């Protein structure tokens, strides 16, 4: 079982390393999201440089990168504790993809994907939190920061077994948003008003 768990952790990282934003933009004839807009290969930046359909495609694929390995591990009857670490591995792949010189995104959608198998109630709460903050502030980055900050609290009340992996995910995503946090404090962070 240990070998199977390690295999799934590695597989999750490799799946996470497939950058949906870069590949979708490449196939759509769009500029590389790492060099355009906010320079972040994620759905929000794809929304900035293209349209809602393309961004939604990236969002869906990024969510799947988290959901597939965690659900796969669940069906393989891997211990619940390790499911969280498999999810963290998928997010690390998104953030530091081996296939794209370790320059990836911030893993917000992939993290959501890893948490969906815990329960749709949790997924609904996370999506609702993100949408509410975006609607109120028009800042996608702030919505992500608020959502991942409150996620461990949601998990504590719904499935406390997964609190520690969720805390790890939240810490990683907050670290990846450090530049956004600085810009938010300075009032220079860009909004997505024109696209919503």
Swiss-Prot record:
One Pfam family cited in the UniProt record for this chain: G3P_acyltransf
Xref: SMART domains: G3P_acyltransf
Listed pathway(s): Lipid metabolism; phospholipid metabolism
GO BP, one annotated term: phospholipid biosynthetic process
One of the record's GO cellular component terms: plasma membrane
UniProt-listed Enzyme Commission number(s): 2.3.1.275
Record-linked PANTHER family: GLYCEROL-3-PHOSPHATE ACYLTRANSFERASE-RELATED (PTHR30309:SF0), INNER MEMBRANE PROTEIN YGIH (PTHR30309)
Binding partners and assembly: Probably interacts with PlsX.
Protein name: Glycerol-3-phosphate acyltransferase
């Amino acid at each position: 079982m240990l070998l199977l768990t390690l295999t799934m952790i590695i597989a999750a990282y490799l799946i996470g390393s497939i950058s949906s934003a870069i590949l979708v933009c490449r196939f759509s004839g769009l500029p590389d999201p790492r060099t355009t807009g906010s320079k972040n290969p994620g759905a929000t930046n794809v929304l900035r440089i293209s349209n809602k359909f393309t961004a939604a495609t990236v969002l869906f694929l990024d969510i799947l990168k988290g959901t597939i390995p965690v659900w796969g591990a669940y069906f393989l009857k891997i211990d619940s504790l390790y499911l969280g670490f498999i999810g963290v591995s998928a997010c690390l792949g998104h953030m530091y993809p081996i296939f794209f010189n370790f320059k990836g995104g911030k893993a917000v959608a992939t993290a959501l994907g890893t948490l969906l198998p815990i329960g749709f109630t949790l997924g609904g709460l996370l999506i609702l939190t993100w949408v509410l903050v975006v609607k109120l502030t028009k800042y996608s980055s702030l919505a992500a920061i608020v959502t991942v900050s409150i996620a461990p609290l949601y998990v504590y009340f719904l499935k406390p077994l997964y609190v520690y992996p969720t805390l790890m995910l939240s810490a990683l995503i907050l670290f990846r948003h450090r530049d956004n946090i600085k810009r938010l404090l300075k009032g220079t962070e860009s909004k997505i008003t024109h696209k919503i």
